[in-house]
């Protein structure tokens, strides 16, 4: 069973990525995994759950909405929580563990677009070795020119 993974980020980004992922999952009968990353406050406690704040009411409401979106598309959906120290390491480990073929990830903006492009390139290289495609929903400089979309390579 193919797996499409969506990293939970801000509500708008996650909703847009989720709609795109659901459309892809419905067309390919893939399973959708929503990856909820929680930064570990103490790397020594990683994986123990100690020191991780409980979900807020707003987060619970968001997860309910995300589940309803997946149900509207008729897509199998699951939520996967994960503690992490570095974002790139967590994304790579999640893809490797769950054998995801597609990952929608929100790589944080940094002051320099060159640095962000390098980070995206590096993450793409890691994921490529795992046979996983990365989609980031990058926006052009003018926000009014942007709409959420995915360009898929031609099937050979």
Identify the role of each PLM range:
Residues 2-48, 130, 155-156:
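Small/aliphatic-rich secondary-structure junction motif
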Residues 17, 44-47, 90-92, 115-116, ...:
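Short, well-ordered secondary-structure micro-motifs
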Residues 33-35, 78-82, 133-137:
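General small-molecule cofactor/ligand-binding pocket signal
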Residues 55-78:
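A glycine-rich helix N-cap at a beta->alpha junction
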Residues 104-126, 144-145:
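Glycine-rich, Arg-bearing micro-motifs that act as flexible, cationic patches
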Residues 106, 124-139:
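Short, acidic/small-residue loops that bind anionic groups at enzyme active sites
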């Amino acid at each position: 069973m193919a797996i499409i993974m969506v990293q939970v980020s801000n509500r708008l980004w996650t909703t847009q990525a989720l709609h795109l992922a659901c459309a892809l999952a419905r067309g390919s009968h893939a399973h959708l995994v929503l990856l909820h990353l929680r930064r570990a406050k103490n790397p020594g406690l990683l994986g123990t759950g100690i020191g991780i704040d409980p979900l807020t009411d707003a987060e619970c409401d968001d997860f309910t909405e995300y589940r309803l979106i997946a149900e509207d598309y008729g897509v199998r959906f699951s939520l996967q929580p994960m503690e992490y120290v570095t974002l790139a390491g967590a994304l790579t480990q999640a893809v490797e563990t769950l054998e995801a073929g597609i990952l929608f990830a929100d790589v944080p903006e940094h002051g320099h677009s060159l640095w962000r492009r390098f980070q995206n390139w590096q993450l793409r290289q890691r994921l490529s070795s795992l046979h996983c495609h990365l989609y980031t929903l990058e926006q052009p400089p003018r926000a009014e020119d942007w709409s959420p979309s995915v360009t898929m390579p031609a099937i050979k």
